[in-house]
């Protein structure tokens, strides 16, 4: 591993005079990271460059290739056309985001133009190094133009590279010498990464010699594994910046007591004192410590916006914390030039954008004497939300940026943000990766970020430039979120990020890439197997699994009534050859890539109950709907609803006030807290709790009655006084209620009676949904076997909730949750195939494996049609013992969705009492 060192005076002597002159005009000197990267790249070695955002990685990757292209173009400019190098792409840049690719293409124009001008000024020919971009937004005419006249540098995405390799456009790639993969960390741990790894090996098969691979990554663990992902069978040198990013991260709570939020005063809307006037405290029951089932469910529901956000909750006179958060955010936006506000869901992104615009309009309206009682008008969708209402004042302070915003609007927001013309953007992870946003001087995060790695990326958007200090604040919405925010902040300061694990032997991705490769060439099965095994995610692929995929694609499971199992390729076993069938190439490009269609069901009232037809209550994840039946009681927001009907795309509900209900989940927003982060969370709670109850706290009392060591730790983590106070009071309240704090070493089982007289058994655990979901499955299986009823288990990041009917027998407790590790593994493996998760993931895997034909290239069938067809396929597939996509679906559930390794280790610790 090469560590960045101090720059040397001769770092640029390896480049031409023109490149050196341009660089020194643009920058004071190379960064240590750039110099180390150039040492490796100059020698032709593969390189993985790891550094925080804004450290000059991209220019480090491109500059050698640009210099070589410029010299070659200048040297051959006077030669006859037939003696010049042939047309073709020389540098291939792959980005996980189209926006990032477009940003890189824009940023390349300055060095290309500047270096070319210097060469011309020195008396040489004006070299022209051309760039081009191919993504899903590229029109057919543009694609044909790229094929006729390929650029020297092509910017693309993993999916578009696959499409090029599966068409005649691949001929333009036979000249590639350098492949740059940006944001490697965002790809390596997913099926998208496995797909790209196979595409890179297919690309190498086209070339006379393997291309030099350069990977760019934010801070990542483990480095060697990511390097192996990048290089496949080839060695990769890791160049890493060992210094921690320069950050100033704060955790801010805008009220003194989050369980007794003062009513937000309507007249105090300006300046930092916003919200201090108004009525006295009014207790918010859902924010109390975890004293009951209702309180825990409220705490576990912290990832969703309060139900009344679109009505009284975010309005004047409310005792919600939201008006205080909104006012604090607006104060920060007005105090800075440009601000990004990150949130964790698209719905919250839209709502917060609308509220900031609304609040800004009201502040300006008061200043200008605008009639604030004028009729409200919807915010225009290009400026904010279509889901909320705002006064007629123009919404000029904030715009939304997320995956559902149109391409044109996203580009407009990015341009305005980069130019410093837009004061605020509210975004999801769509702006998390390395788009150059050097004008951003503040990042705010509402609720804790999904992980420490994500937090580093998001806060790193501020001052995204060499030497810039990133400044950001996290606004928890509940007391329990303060814990997650503090853990994220501490993890950022200490560089403790979560590990990335490669997705291994994904058979659905293998099936898609096999059809694509065979569509272009007749292949020897053994040669294709060797190509596949060169890719790191498939380096341990068993030949038996490989052959099972070939058998499936060759029609082994074809039946008269299921065309989806009909053969995609021909496998000539006698000759060991793989051949295309008519239409193979079309099938390969119709459903390219790995990003799944994830579906949501609208939740509506019956017709006639709403003022204007069916009134929308919310939406549910399709996996939640698969688990639901007519008559079930569910919670949306703070209300309970009884399901009266489930249609192909809607759930029709009726109010069920006062009824005990299941809490919904949404897998589309992420898989939940990593177990590693949960362990950090538990250790943090254990340390803080010890500082409250120990002798040290009494002897050396710091702020809020905690030990000096804990007080100093919380302050170093960036918690303001109110954040510290609320965190300490949460821990005290929990100890008063149960006598013990759940942490990484101590899991707490709590029992209480619910509203209907049944018992709730709750397991408090920090280890996250990926651990808790399979654990809850095993517990449900045990309860059914012993007691004969369904416990209606619900798992979330903070634990498991069971519903136990009131009986005369002894109420079960901790014995429900303790398992032999191997027994638990067996139960989960046996039961996973009957879960809603399995059904939903089977549909996605079947689509990736090209078993569900779309309507047309790039167009998906309606989700209800996909679900119907997938159900038929699943029923047929279950009759085959080792159907590859059943095997893959089980692998995805057990390895990618569930964290069975962490659960197994946890059960071993429970057994050992450690």
List PLM regions with ranges:
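Short, basic/aromatic beta-hairpin or loop at an interaction surface
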Residues: 598-619
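Helicase motor core with emphasis on the C-terminal RecA-like subdomain
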Residues: 6-11, 15-21, 42-48, 60-158, ...
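ATP-binding Walker
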Residues: 55-56
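N-terminal pre-P-loop "Q-motif" helix
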Residues: 28-43
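Extended, highly charged accessory segments
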Residues: 529-532, 536-600, 664, 672-914
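Short beta-strand-centered aromatic/proline hotspots
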Residues: 639-646
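Short, well-ordered loop/turn sites that connect or cap secondary structure elements
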Residues: 595-597, 628, 634
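Short, solvent-exposed secondary-structure boundary/capping segments
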Residues: 647-664
